[in-house]
């Protein structure tokens, strides 16, 4: 019931159903997307305008939400240039993300923070083929993913995230979102239903199951008086860069945060539960190790453990809406060919039914924390 695949929120349910996507209308998209304008020369020109002169070598990195490039510079250095998805965030929201990163860096919490550009700002603007873009540049950092099967690694991550939260609780975001049942559950559900892309044969079962699951999410959030704080928001292992001493170039070794694009206000447990996988017994041991480290730097409210499965449920629903809303981006259909198929929605219904069962079971038992 607590398999690692549920954290991923979407797997290929039935490749044979890919043809059904045409019947949903989900594969229709404009002939041009704003990111289509980001030619190599356009990327280099935009960076050049900020004072970062590329030598002509660049490599597009793996990112679906934004477009990210490693760019070699004339001075022998390298940066990672991030072009934000047009229309997703405002300047104020991005600057809150950058400000949070700067606060973390000032508190010596390892984070790959955006560079201050030639005009003294971390956020730049470029007009490319009539399309406005927001962009930022980051130092290039190497490393690898954390070894989550090691208790010492989990304890280290607990200490690291507690330090991040100690900074996060000092003030609130004003412009960025709050992770709650409305923003990440009910609103995505409404958008999916309005999009009219779920095949009729799967619609009633999925909608009914989703509504039942959200009723349990609502009840869980009402029962746990969690104090929201600034979070990483998407703290899965892929967003944690583990750096060894030989790789640090003067930085600290251990975990580094590399992406605050999804930073939100929310409960502390949101930045912890995605480190867990396996059976309930396995997750209990993993969370015990994480919290042994976490509580060295910050108090943890054990009642938030009851939000793990509700938060997993919100992530599943939000992920489906995210795919639907990004389908006009040419990068998405080849990467997620199963999305929108009858098999996909059937699998989502089954996974939501599993979540209903999981939310009805007792939360992780870590009574020793009281």
What are the language-model segments listed below?
Residues 74-173:
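ATP-binding pocket architecture of kinase catalytic cores
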Residues 2-12, 17-54:
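Juxta-kinase regulatory segment immediately upstream of eukaryotic protein kinase catalytic domains
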